[in-house]
């Protein structure tokens, strides 16, 4: 009989340190809260210090040990500085969640090269920057878990989202390559692919009528940031110790049924 502990416990991440990019608001902040409420010490980063300060205050109010760093994930030097500060503050880095993302709906005919590049740079290049720096500064020698936030809309394509589906498809491919190369070092790399989440800025930008969009999935509702964050928790934890290179789709089955064609 195994002596492995159940994953369904409040101290699942006790003793671990997690970094969440784009962690000041929305899914990133909820992910930091969920990881922290399960015992992790949490560092968050994004570009706006005021948002980071408010987020850390909220996390600390819940008894979570938290810190922040101002960082543009497109800049390798800033990413490196933030990870070095996490290591100085907490002494280790066990979990990296690449959540920073950009999004805005626009038809391809109106999408500028700079607009396309901006989203690819934040989503894909940012994921590369953070993952590579974390690996070189800590994970290569100590192991750990990387969870990359992607999407499911790239599986079929979606109107008004050419820049996003391109970036997310790149994240999927990058994640699998990292899983293969870094597995021998004890580094697991997995993907969470969320669908529409109620109340998030992404949903507000993409769909004015969130309920109409959500009803396209078999569960007939939008998801919540908590439901997605709990998927991240699983992949970040030792409960997923034999899982790498995998994608956990958390979209109510929408990728099976939703049309990418606008109404």
Where in this protein do the model-derived segments appear?
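Short C-terminal tail/terminal secondary-structure segment
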Residues: 2-9, 156, 233, 244-263
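Conserved glycine-rich cofactor-binding loop
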Residues: 17, 24-26
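Alpha-helical segment proximal to the catalytic Tyr-Lys
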Residues: 136, 180-184, 241
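Short, small/polar-rich loop/turn modules that mediate ligand/substrate recognition or access, typified
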Residues: 97, 183, 188, 243-245
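Active-site helix of classical SDR
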Residues: 131, 167, 175
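Substrate-binding pocket helix/loop in short-chain dehydrogenase/reductase
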Residues: 107-108, 115-120, 203, 213
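C-terminal substrate-recognition "lid" of short-chain dehydrogenase/reductases
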Residues: 128, 221-250, 255-256
């Amino acid at each position: 009989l195994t002596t492995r502990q159940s994953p369904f416990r409040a101290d699942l991440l006790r003793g671990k340190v997690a970094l969440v990019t784009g962690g000041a608001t929305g899914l990133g902040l909820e992910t930091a809260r969920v990881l922290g409420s399960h015992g992790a010490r949490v560092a968050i980063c994004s570009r706006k210090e005021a948002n980071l300060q408010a987020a850390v205050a909220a996390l600390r109010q819940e008894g979570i040990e938290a810190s922040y760093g101002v960082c543009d994930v497109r800049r390798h030097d800033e990413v490196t500085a933030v990870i070095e500060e996490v290591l100085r503050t907490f002494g280790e880095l066990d979990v990296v969640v690449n959540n920073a993302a950009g999004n805005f709906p626009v038809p391809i005919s109106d999408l500028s090269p700079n607009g396309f590049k901006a989203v690819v740079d934040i989503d894909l290049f940012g994921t590369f920057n953070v993952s590579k720096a974390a690996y070189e500064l800590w994970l290569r020698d100590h192991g750990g878990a990387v969870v990359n936030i992607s999407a499911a809309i790239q599986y079929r394509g979606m109107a008004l989202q050419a820049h996003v589906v391109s970036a997310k498809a790149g994240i999927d491919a990058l994640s699998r390559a990292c899983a293969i190369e870094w597995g021998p070092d004890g580094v697991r790399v997995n993907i969470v692919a969320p669908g529409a989440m109620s109340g998030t800025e992404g949903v507000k930008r993409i769909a004015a009528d969130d309920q109409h969009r959500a009803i396209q999935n078999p569960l007939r509702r939008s998801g919540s940031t908590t439901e997605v964050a709990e998927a991240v928790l699983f992949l970040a934890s030792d409960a997923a110790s034999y899982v790498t290179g995998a994608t956990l789709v958390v979209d109510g089955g929408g990728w099976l049924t939703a049309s990418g064609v606008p109404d």
